[in-house]
Structures are given as structure tokens and as C-alpha cells.
UniProtKB/Swiss-Prot annotation:
Role noted for this protein: An aminoacyl-tRNA editing enzyme that deacylates mischarged D-aminoacyl-tRNAs. Also deacylates mischarged glycyl-tRNA(Ala), protecting cells against glycine mischarging by AlaRS. Acts via tRNA-based rather than protein-based catalysis; rejects L-amino acids rather than detecting D-amino acids in the active site. By recycling D-aminoacyl-tRNA to D-amino acids and free tRNA molecules, this enzyme counteracts the toxicity associated with the formation of D-aminoacyl-tRNA entities in vivo and helps enforce protein L-homochirality. ATPase involved in DNA replication, may facilitate loading of CDC45 onto pre-replication complexes.
Protein name stated in the entry: D-aminoacyl-tRNA deacylase 1
NCBIfam families: D-aminoacyl-tRNA deacylase
Lineage: Eukaryota, Metazoa, Chordata, Craniata, Vertebrata
Localization annotation: Nucleus; Cytoplasm
Gene Ontology BP term (one): DNA replication
Catalytic activity: glycyl-tRNA(Ala) + H2O = tRNA(Ala) + glycine + H(+); a D-aminoacyl-tRNA + H2O = a tRNA + a D-alpha-amino acid + H(+)
Motif Gly-cisPro motif, important for rejection of L-amino acids, residue range(s) on this chain: 139-140
Subunit structure of this chain's protein: Homodimer. Interacts with CDC45 and TOPBP1.
Annotated GO MF terms: D-aminoacyl-tRNA deacylase activity; DNA binding; metal ion binding; tRNA binding
Length: 209
């Protein structure tokens, strides 16, 4: 699970030209849910978000207070594109949790936020909708969170096994293209006796490298 947390002076969500949600001072959270996420990651992320110290205290000391300490608002927006993996220059989202499962998981995430904080201060967008998210970033302050934290899974055999399988899938994907090209290059060519001496060179020059 990934989250981008932004400290804001205000933020809002508009769908179809109509504003459906808005907050004043607080944090805006863009949340990307992975197909590997469980209740454990959910609870960990909720704790991190609500206790993240991105505000100053009464004396002006920076990084001293959380959104709960200040009793500010939280706007949460589901954003599966945070689970993007690039294939060349094209985004691929196969690591994101499937839509129906993700919606239920996201609702559980919101429920946990409201249980852990004041429910009237938690706002959200509209899951699965095309939204315009208006964010007035304060600072700017933007923090990236990940659950589990990068490297934290190395001591967990189950997580390690998942990572190994993901890596194997990536390696197979990368190896598939070159192996086919290699077979093509190594295949014996039939000699065209009617062609000119430059014909073979012309054919090979049309191949993609």
C-alpha cells in the first residue's frame, strides 16, 4: 500500500462539475492499494497517516504535531495509479488490487480512519469516479508512505516469497522478447539464388534491431 500525504490549507474533490467533498487545514491523502495488501497493512497505514508530524506546535517548532494533535481534517482519495509499474514509457497497473476488491478494502480503510480519529473530520472522494482533486499544498509539504516500508519485508518469509515471485515474473517478461528475437536471428536463412548480391543485406536491414 502506498500513500502520498500532502499538508494543505484547503482541498476539495469535484465530480461532473459538482463539488462533493472539501476540507480546510489538514492533510490530503492519495491512496494506492496493492493486490498484496491485507488488514495488517491497512492498520499500519492508518496509524502512520494520523500520527505523521507535519505541523508546527504552538511555539512555531516545525514537524511537531500530527493532524490529530491539531484536530485538523483529512481528505482521502483512492488513486490506483500509485501502483504503477513502467513498461518502457507505458504505465502498467497489474500490481493494483482489482476494482471490486479494492472498493471494499478502501471502505474498510476509511472506516478504520474514522474509528481511530474523529469521524466528522474524515472526508473522501468517490471511488472509481473521474475526479478533479484541487489541492492547495501548504509549504509545499509532501510525504510518501509505504506499507510495509521498503526493505521491511526481508525478514518475513511470506513477504520475501511474494517479492521473489514478482521478480521472477518480471524476469520472464523481460526474457520473452529477446528469446523470440534470438530464435529468429539464429534460424537458418534460405538462399535466394535469383536475388542480387545485395538482396540479403537489404532484407536484413529491414529487420528491427
Amino acid at each position: 500500500m502506498k500513500a502520498v500525504v500532502q499538508r494543505v490549507t484547503r482541498a476539495s474533490v469535484t465530480v461532473g462539475g459538482e463539488q462533493i467533498s472539501a476540507i480546510g487545514r489538514g492533510i490530503c491523502v492519495l491512496l494506492g492499494i496493492s493486490m498484496e495488501d491485507s488488514q495488517k497493512e491497512l492498520e499500519h497505514m492508518v496509524r502512520k497517516i494520523l500520527n505523521l508530524r507535519v505541523f508546527e506546535d504552538e511555539s512555531g517548532k516545525h514537524w511537531s504535531k500530527s493532524v490529530m494533535d491539531k484536530e485538523y481534517e483529512v481528505l482521502c482519495v483512492s488513486q490506483f495509479t500509485l501502483q504503477c509499474v513502467l513498461k518502457g514509457n507505458k504505465p502498467d497497473f497489474h500490481l493494483a488490487m482489482p476494482t471490486e476488491q479494492a472498493e471494499s478494502f478502501y471502505n474498510s480503510f476509511l472506516e478504520q480512519l474514522r474509528k481511530s480519529y474523529r469521524p466528522e473530520l474524515i472526508r473522501d472522494g468517490k471511488f472509481g469516479a473521474y475526479m478533479q482533486v484541487h489541492i492547495q499544498n501548504d509549504g509545499p509539504v509532501t510525504i510518501e508512505l509505504e506499507s510495509p516500508a521498503p526493505g521491511a519485508a526481508s525478514s518475513d518469509p511470506k513477504q520475501l516469497s511474494k517479492l521473489e515471485k514478482q521478480q521472477q515474473r518480471k524476469e520472464k517478461t523481460r526474457a520473452k522478447g529477446p528469446s523470440e528475437s534470438s530464435k529468429e536471428r539464429n534460424a537458418p536463412r534460405k538462399e535466394d539464388r535469383s536475388a542480387s548480391s545485395g538482396a540479403e543485406g537489404d532484407v536484413s536491414s529491414e529487420r528491427e534491431p
